[in-house]
Amino acid sequence: MRVAKLKEAYPTAKVELWTEDEHRLGLKPVLRKVWSRKGERPTVKVHQRYQWTYLYSFVRPHTGEVHWLILPKANVEVFSLALEHFAKEVGAGKKRRRILLVLDRAGWHTGKEVRVPEGIHLEFLPSHSPELQPAERLWPLSNEGVANRYFEELEELEEALIECCVALSDQPEIIRSYTRYHWWPKVA
């Protein structure tokens, strides 16, 4: 197991297991079924436009701790910036903290140009296996804050996402219940 190897290589460091994923959201609305009175038909204003923003999540399933970033793209350069920001936020790179970050095999995760900060160690899931990625389970939760809502501009959508992500961050037990699979390694 990769965690054991990291603990052996860094015996005085605390090794933590995190996972990361991205979710594209845009001005094309997220639609949900809703309850309504008998005989009434609920409506949602829709104006299909193809402008996108990306929600990055770094989650530690063992504790429910989560760090969110809203960024304009998903590519090698932006992913490298997200890694740098995350490493600073959690204090990775210090001799006493190492992060094993589990990722899918998106092209921007595996590119040779990815800059991996000191203290972050990448581990890739098998190809085409989103069901193994705990962070994937966060997207229905994040969608709830923007479902059935019309946004004129991306900035409005991003504001709604910020509210939703802050609320979710304050509820680690919910995050943990969605992301901590029974087979996920229990690394303290």
Predicted regions: what is each one?
Residues 1-188:
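Short functional hotspots at interaction and active-site rims
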